[in-house]
């Protein structure tokens, strides 16, 4: 008798991870358009009408913080608290939730509670944080939808710090939960935990990664590749934190501040641990790392494999971390789990640390190799010495750095919720001035459109400028966008993708229009450059549609304000610099990525669906918005007219495409007589090659598709122009 099989999946009773052969296994180089459709509203049990800011407004935040403070010392038998206080555990949970953020692509971080899902919930560096979340469950149950998991995780870290005597900088709610794993985040190409295939032969870490090994949030605490060398660990620590957007001072403050509390756990070899949560047996109900050693908890806990605490009072804010670091010499040893660590030599009795669970037992302070890099690294050591000598400076630096760490990916201050939001504005928040003048209305908008279209700027130039401003937006950390008008400043006005010469000319023209309007306007009305850039692009779209026989009005929402150069962190904004923009048919030379992959990544950051990506690219091509005026993918003889020509001509079966080089980055399309008709990039031809994208293109290329194309383009255009308008949501 044959094995029984599931009629839907074809699985037999013995299910393995590879039991089903999907399309990606058959065709591994196929682009993954599923990235554009993850987190569908149907996956959200709260529905797409749930208003989290409104729910949070009804939260009794002070009552929740009081309950969290009580939880800190409410030790549970199933997972006893170290020294009767869960503070260290909750700080680690919050830290590791936020610490996955990386500035290169804005992904990771605490913004959506992704620590609840694979792969993060099963990373080796997150061992036993599943217990921390289970400890929070009674409070999540009590307060329900008024607090998201994402907010609760970070708030618990804040309350943990405060309950042990530290004064935090503040807290903002506003993080919304996701309900499935994030598929768009590249965590590395390794296939084994704690392995490293992410460094070049010169030792440089691949972009956009920040952690040094698969399954780590930061660095290997035992040292680079497990070698206990504090000097060699220093560059790893500095680079990893810098890739999160942290300065040297913030790096030292975070390491020292975080390790002021709690302890490491390595009572026995990690081989005593069973599978992580995602691999745990069904009856373990999502709890991973079942510990077979003795009681499996308390004094027998195994987490990182390192064993011990850093300072004599692990549940109190003080200078103990630096005092231990600079008072003692350190001896290399191994923990009971076999992990490299350092133990203080000749410890004074008053510096012996009481055991977290066994009365009468004490041990010497420990440091990890990464900790000692603060003492031995020539760049971090002076900062650590200064903090050792100035407790107030250390406390202030840690408070600010902790707030930055836990709020970096929350987005602009307009998204901050709650009574604990600090008033002080930080430059890393990409501040935009508050609206301080009456807005232009329909009459003024109409008049401005006429003036903008009469300037002599081409449709393509106006569209490209607006697109360049708005398309910097990243949904991952909600940075970028047109608001603030920062395309006027460095670094954006020098990026190759923005055609600096054309951009300079367009901006000068728009500034003239702005100055004239603001000087002549009555009633105090003014228009910002940020608004004018978007309005000019939208007016150009209307004119292009009219030229094709379609009368449309592109919705425009005024209210953007202009930031100043002083409000713009040049180095931080340079992280938004695209490596490719398929919508403008530009890609950095020498990039080892396929143009179509970069296009999908950019579309995902813009929150676009596959149809929206398709109609935007096709429309931008015919509008003439390509970088540098290049003709790749401009499959029309009517440049500047909003039409479905790109779609129609891409599907023309009389055209034969062939690559221009072995690299297969550029293509020539020839007609039946062999004459060159078109040129294209990979970002163009993927819309005819990929079956899903081709199906979408067919809809727009149909005889009845022209009006739909224009309508859908306008809708997608407005969506991108308003991605950062959190001030009106």
Swiss-Prot record:
The active site is at residue 96. This is Catalase-peroxidase. Bifunctional enzyme with both catalase and broad-spectrum peroxidase activity. Gene3D superfamilies: 1.10.520.10, Peroxidase, domain 2. InterPro entries: Catalase_peroxidase, Haem_peroxidase, Haem_peroxidase_sf, Peroxidases_AS, Peroxidases_heam-ligand_BS. Keywords: Heme, Hydrogen peroxide, Iron, Metal-binding, Oxidoreductase, Peroxidase. GO terms for cellular component: cytosol. There is a cross-link at residues 218-244 (Tryptophyl-tyrosyl-methioninium (Tyr-Met) (with W-95)). It comes from Synechococcus sp. (strain CC9605). The record marks 92 as: Transition state stabilizer. Heme b binds at residue 259. The keyword Acyltransferase does not apply. Its EC number is 1.11.1.21. It catalyses: H2O2 + AH2 = A + 2 H2O; 2 H2O2 = O2 + 2 H2O. Binds 1 heme b (iron(II)-protoporphyrin IX) group per dimer. GO terms for biological process: cellular response to hydrogen peroxide; hydrogen peroxide catabolic process. Pfam families: peroxidase. GO terms for molecular function: catalase activity; heme binding; metal ion binding. Homodimer or homotetramer. It comes from the Bacteria. Its cofactor is heme b. Formation of the three residue Trp-Tyr-Met cross-link is important for the catalase, but not the peroxidase activity of the enzyme. There is a cross-link at residues 95-218 (Tryptophyl-tyrosyl-methioninium (Trp-Tyr) (with M-244)). HAMAP family: Catal_peroxid. NCBIfam families: cat_per_HPI (TIGR00198), PRK15061.1 (NF011635). Belongs to the peroxidase family. Peroxidase/catalase subfamily.
